[in-house]
């Protein structure tokens, strides 16, 4: 596969136009088997037992069956090769799908790389860590923010149409069409979104379909945003001091090219800020109310004509930044108008200018966290701590570790919020709930638990090592700056949890 990827530029036609022979390479399914084995190593033991009896002879027979199939392909039916081994009926279907996905991913990666190289100024950072800089970003040129939810009622023919843009091999398209229809029918009446986004165990094939679908949406945003651009290209000379160079544009004198030996650069004002997680997207734009409505109309029109999908009006919400706040991934993004006085002196004249900058301040939703703790029986509706009765059968160390893990997850996720006092109120609730749980287990009181454990209740549970790390960083940094503890293993579950809650609130 590495050699296949390295020779991409030389044999690009084979990758884009003749993918069908690659679908029947046995080594690709060996790669898919290794990937499936690594991913399922921490799952059920039966899945690992099944993988030990994996047979490439069965894969060859499945490939031969696909090749000789005339009308339709039954990959998701009863395909258990050996009932004596108790093999999962979908095991070989998953491996075949992952083998097909390996070929599609390589070709898709080359196509996306070629597209990004052709688009100037398009930097796509595919990580959740790029969301946090947006929450601290300054929006000097934006006055509207649009909350977009990507539609997920995807028909298989729409996905086939997307593949036709970069796959010209007719047998490959017919094979993909048959697999997609069979794959959708395997979920009966469930929405395809549950298979793509909210499936309990996302397969490699489902993730590839969702990424391809969203890629088409984001690739449309590049020319779409350039059309509604309000910034003009400006020329400026290079400076030894590059700090806040965009504020010095008005004071630059452009010399003729015959005299100037400086390098001429091209600059565009940062008028747009875009971030996406899952099906939620936030776009900060500059323009009037009429222009934002036109932008919203063109987005509706594009989605209905290109994807043949009905775009519900509630999926796009455009609000003015100075009058409201938005919620994203469990944060409330509060907009703060910050006035700034600038004095500029030119010869004997003194000019005073008032500038207003827009800043986003992330706020932790304390009420929502209290509601979640009350739902999980850590406290009541009013926020009064109660004992966790379902944990009284555990050992003391397990109880302390579980409460410690809950607080660490919340502290990591909301470490950059401006309302840290509310987080310590949550910590106080968890601490008393932990003490009451231990007291209920030993049939004693909270005072007795504190006397027996002493400082161990506060050191072993709710350890302050991570808070000490943040405080040591804060000594060397400005007090206005915030520190984000970007632990990807703790961020993703909470982000998905708040995403589901907000989607239910919008739909209801």
Curated annotation (Swiss-Prot):
Localisation per UniProt entry: Plastid, Chloroplast
Cystine bridges: none
Protein keywords: Chloroplast, mRNA processing, Plastid, RNA-binding, tRNA processing
Gene Ontology CC: chloroplast
Endpoints of the signal sequence: none
Gene Ontology biological-process annotations: mRNA processing; RNA splicing; tRNA processing
Molecular-function annotations in GO: RNA binding
Similarity remark: Belongs to the intron maturase 2 family. MatK subfamily.
Function description: Usually encoded in the trnK tRNA gene intron. Probably assists in splicing its own and other chloroplast group II introns.
Protein name: Maturase K
């Amino acid at each position: 596969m590495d050699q296949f990827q390295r020779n991409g530029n030389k044999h690009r036609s084979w990758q884009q136009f003749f993918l069908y022979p690659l679908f029947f390479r046995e080594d690709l399914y060996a790669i898919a088997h290794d990937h499936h084995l690594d991913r399922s190593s921490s799952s059920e033991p039966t899945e690992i037992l099944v993988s030990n009896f994996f047979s490439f002879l069965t894969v060859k027979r499945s490939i031969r069956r696909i090749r000789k199939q005339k009308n339709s392909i039954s990959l998701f039916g009863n395909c258990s090769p050996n009932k004596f081994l108790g093999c999962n009926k979908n095991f070989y279907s998953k491996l075949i799908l992952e083998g097909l996905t390996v070929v599609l991913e390589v070709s898709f990666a080359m196509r996306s790389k070629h597209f990004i190289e052709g688009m100037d100024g398009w930097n796509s950072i595919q990580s959740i860590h790029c969301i946090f800089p947006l929450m601290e970003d300054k929006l000097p040129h934006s006055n509207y923010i649009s909350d977009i939810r990507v539609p997920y009622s995807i028909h298989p023919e729409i996905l086939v149409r997307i593949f036709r843009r970069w796959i010209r091999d007719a047998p490959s398209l017919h094979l993909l069409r048959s697999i997609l229809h069979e794959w959708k029918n395997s979920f009966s009446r469930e929405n395809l979104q549950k298979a793509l986004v909210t499936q309990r165990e996302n397969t490699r094939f489902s993730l590839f379909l969702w990424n391809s679908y969203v890629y088409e949406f984001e690739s449309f945003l590049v020319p779409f945003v350039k059309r509604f651009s309000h910034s003009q290209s400006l020329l400026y000379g290079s400076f030894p001091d590059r700090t806040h160079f965009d504020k010095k544009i008005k004071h630059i004198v452009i010399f003729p090219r015959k005299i100037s030996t400086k390098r001429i650069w091209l600059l565009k004002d940062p008028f747009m800020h875009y971030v996406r997680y899952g099906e939620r997207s936030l776009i900060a734009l500059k323009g009037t109310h009429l222009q934002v409505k036109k932008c919203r109309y063109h987005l509706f029109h594009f989605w209905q004509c290109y994807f043949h999908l009905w775009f519900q009006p509630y999926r796009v919400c455009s609000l003015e930044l100075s009058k409201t706040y938005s919620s994203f991934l469990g944060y409330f993004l509060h907009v703060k108008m910050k006035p700034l006085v600038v004095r500029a002196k030119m010869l004997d004249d003194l000019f005073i200018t008032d500038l207003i900058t827009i800043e986003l301040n992330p706020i932790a939703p304390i009420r929502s966290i209290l509601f979640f703790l009350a739902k999980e029986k850590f406290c009541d509706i009013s926020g009064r701590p109660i004992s966790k009765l379902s944990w009284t059968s555990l050992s003391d160390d397990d109880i302390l570790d579980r409460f410690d893990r809950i607080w660490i997850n919340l502290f990591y996720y909301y470490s950059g919020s401006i309302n840290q006092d509310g987080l310590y109120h949550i910590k106080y609730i968890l601490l008393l709930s932990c003490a009451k749980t231990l007291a209920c287990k030993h049939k004693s009181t909270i005072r007795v638990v504190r006397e027996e454990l002493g400082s161990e209740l506060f050191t072993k549970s709710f350890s302050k090592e991570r808070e000490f790390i943040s405080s040591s960083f804060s000594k060397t940094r400005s007090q206005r700056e915030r520190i984000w503890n970007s632990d990807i293993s703790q961020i993703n579950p909470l982000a998905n949890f708040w995403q589901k809650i907000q989607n239910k609130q919008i739909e209801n």
